[in-house]
C-alpha cells in the first residue's frame, strides 16, 4: 500500500500537471460513499390494504376500468366493501332499511354479514344491475311520447343524448378476426335515421363473412360524460348480415362512375369501389319504430324481441282489420327529401284479398287528382373521406303503416331501385317513360309506378299499392277463427 501511495505522490509531483485537481479526484474515490440505486416504487408493489384504501375513493367507472389492468387489480376492484358503499349511496335518500323489501334489507347494512356472506364481486353485480335498470326505465319513458301524425316516438334525439347511444358495425372475416368501425355520420328524418360509416382501411371484401350492427351505450351513462369508447359499454345486437358472395347474393341498387350499391335486408346498403372491388362505405337505414328498444334492450348475442301481440277480437265488425289504415311515406336520398306524404282512411274490400295478400291502393292510376309530383332528381348521396357522389335512379323508402288504433302495423326503411318499364304511358295527361320501384320483405311488398315528364324534368307517382301479408293480418287482429275470412285465402303464401 505504501508503494501505491508513493507512486501517487510521484505522479502528482510531475511539473506541468494539475496536481491538486488530480489528487482531489483520486481522494474522492476513497472518501465518497457508494451510491445505491433507488428502489422503483410503483402502485402495483403497494400492499393490498393500501390499494383498497385508494380504490375506495374512486367512482364505479374508474373501478371497472382498473379491473381490466391485471388479475390483482381485478380481484381488488371486486371488493364487496367498496361496492356495497357505492350501492348504498345510490339508493334514494328517503329509503331506509325498514322501508325496503326483505330482498334489499341486507344490501344497505354495512355489517360483516353483508360483506363476508357474499362472494367477491356480488355487490358490484348488484350495483350494475340496479344502475342499468334505472337507466333503461328513464330512457324508455321518452319512447312514450308519440308524434300524432306518424304514431312514432318523437323524442329520439333527446333519448340518444340521455343514453349516450351510438351505433357501430363489426366485420368478421373467415378466419374469425373482427374489424370494428365506429366513425359514422348520422342523418335524421321524420321517421328514420340513416347512418353512414366510411373508413380508409376496410378489410378485403373477399375474406369477409358477416357484418353485425350494434347499438352501443355506456354501461353507466350517468357517470360517463362524454361517453368514451375505452370505458365499459353495453352492446345490443340489432342485425346480422352475410357478406359472402355479396355481389351475387344481394340486390344491386345502382351505380355511378366510382361505386356500385348493393342492398341487404333489413335496410343495409353497401358501397363497393368499381376499380378495386372493395368496400367504400356502409349505410344503415333504421326506422324509428322500436329503434331505441332494439338499440338498448338487446344483448351482445341476442336481438331484442318485442313482447307478443295481444289482439282483441271484434265480433261486431265483419270487416275488422280491413279498414281505417293510415300511411306515412317518405322518399329521400339521405341528404335530400323527395316526397313526404300522409294518407288516411285506407281500406281493402274482401274481394281484394288474394294470393296471401291484403291489397291497399294508395294512389290510383286513373285518379290524377291523387298523383304525386317528386321534388328533384331521385338518387342516393354517399361520401367517404376523399370522394362524394350521387347514385341516380334509386332512393330510400321510409314506410309507416298504422292500423285503425293508430299503432304501427308495418314499418321499414330500405333502399329501393327504379327500373325502366317496357310499357308506355297510357295516360293522356302524362306522356313519358314509365319507371317502377318494388320492395319486398317478410311482411308485405310495395309497388310504385312513376312517369317521367321530359318537359318539366320531374317524376310523377301515378300508382302506389301496398300488399300486406295475410299471415301478419291474422296474427295482428286474431282472425284465425273468423269464418267469414277463411274463404279468402288468409294463409301464408310464397311470393
Question: Where are each of the predicted segments found?
Answer:
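Short hydrophobic alpha-helical "box" of cullin-RING ligase substrate receptors
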Residues: 45-59, 63-77, 83
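Substrate-receptor adaptors of ubiquitin E3 ligases
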Residues: 2-36, 41, 81-495
Amino acid at each position: 500500500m505504501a508503494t501505491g501511495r508513493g507512486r501517487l505522490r510521484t505522479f502528482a509531483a510531475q511539473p506541468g500537471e494539475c496536481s491538486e485537481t488530480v489528487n482531489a479526484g483520486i481522494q474522492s474515490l476513497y472518501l465518497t460513499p457508494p451510491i445505491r440505486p433507488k428502489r422503483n416504487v410503483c402502485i402495483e408493489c403497494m400492499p393490498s390494504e393500501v390499494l383498497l384504501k385508494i380504490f375506495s375513493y374512486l367512482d364505479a367507472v374508474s373501478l371497472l376500468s382498473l379491473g381490466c389492468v391485471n388479475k390483482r387489480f381485478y380481484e381488488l376492484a371486486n371488493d364487496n366493501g367498496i361496492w356495497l358503499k357505492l350501492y348504498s349511496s345510490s339508493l334514494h335518500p328517503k329509503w331506509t332499511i325498514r322501508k325496503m323489501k326483505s330482498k334489499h334489507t341486507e344490501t344497505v347494512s354495512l355489517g360483516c354479514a353483508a360483506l363476508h356472506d357474499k362472494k367477491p364481486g356480488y355487490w358490484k353485480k348488484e350495483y350494475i344491475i340496479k344502475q342499468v335498470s334505472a337507466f333503461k326505465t328513464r330512457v324508455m319513458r321518452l319512447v312514450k311520447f308519440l308524434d300524432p301524425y306518424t304514431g312514432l316516438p318523437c323524442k329520439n334525439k333527446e333519448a340518444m343524448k340521455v343514453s349516450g347511444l351510438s351505433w357501430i358495425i363489426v366485420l368478421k372475416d373467415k378466419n374469425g378476426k373482427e374489424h370494428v368501425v365506429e366513425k359514422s355520420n348520422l342523418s335524421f328524418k321524420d321517421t328514420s335515421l340513416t347512418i353512414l360509416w366510411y373508413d380508409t382501411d376496410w378489410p378485403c371484401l373477399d375474406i369477409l363473412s358477416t357484418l353485425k350492427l350494434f347499438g352501443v351505450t355506456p354501461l353507466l351513462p350517468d357517470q360517463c360524460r362524454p361517453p368514451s369508447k375505452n370505458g365499459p359499454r353495453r352492446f345490443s345486437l340489432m342485425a346480422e348480415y352475410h357478406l359472402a358472395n355479396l355481389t351475387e347474393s344481394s340486390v344491386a341498387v345502382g351505380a355511378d362512375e366510382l361505386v356500385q350499391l348493393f342492398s341487404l335486408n333489413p335496410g343495409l346498403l353497401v358501397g363497393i369501389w368499381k376499380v378495386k372491388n372493395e368496400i367504400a362505405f356502409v349505410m344503415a337505414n333504421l326506422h324509428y319504430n322500436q329503434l331505441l328498444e332494439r338499440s338498448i334492450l338487446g344483448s351482445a348475442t341476442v336481438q331484442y324481441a318485442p313482447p307478443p301481440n295481444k289482439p282483441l277480437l271484434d265480433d261486431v265488425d265483419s270487416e275488422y282489420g280491413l279498414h281505417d289504415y293510415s300511411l306515412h311515406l317518405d322518399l329521400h336520398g339521405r341528404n335530400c327529401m323527395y316526397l313526404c306524404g300522409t294518407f288516411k282512411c285506407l281500406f281493402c274490400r274482401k274481394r281484394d284479398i288474394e294470393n296471401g295478400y291484403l291489397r291497399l291502393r294508395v294512389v290510383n292510376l286513373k285518379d290524377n287528382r291523387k298523383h304525386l309530383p317528386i321534388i328533384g332528381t331521385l338518387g342516393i348521396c354517399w361520401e367517404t373521406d376523399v370522394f362524394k357522389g350521387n347514385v341516380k335512379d334509386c332512393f330510400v323508402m321510409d314506410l309507416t303503416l298504422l292500423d285503425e288504433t293508430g299503432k304501427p302495423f308495418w314499418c321499414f326503411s330500405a333502399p329501393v331501385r327504379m327500373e325502366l318499364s317496357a310499357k308506355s304511358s297510357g295516360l293522356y295527361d302524362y306522356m313519358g317513360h314509365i319507371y317502377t320501384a318494388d320492395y319486398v320483405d317478410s311482411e308485405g311488398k310495395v309497388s310504385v309506378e312513376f312517369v317521367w315528364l321530359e318537359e318539366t324534368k320531374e317524376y310523377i307517382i301515378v300508382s302506389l299499392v301496398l300488399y300486406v301479408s295475410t299471415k301478419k293480418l291474422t296474427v295482428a287482429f286474431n282472425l284465425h277463427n273468423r269464418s267469414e275470412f277463411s274463404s279468402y285465402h288468409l294463409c301464408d303464401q310464397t311470393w
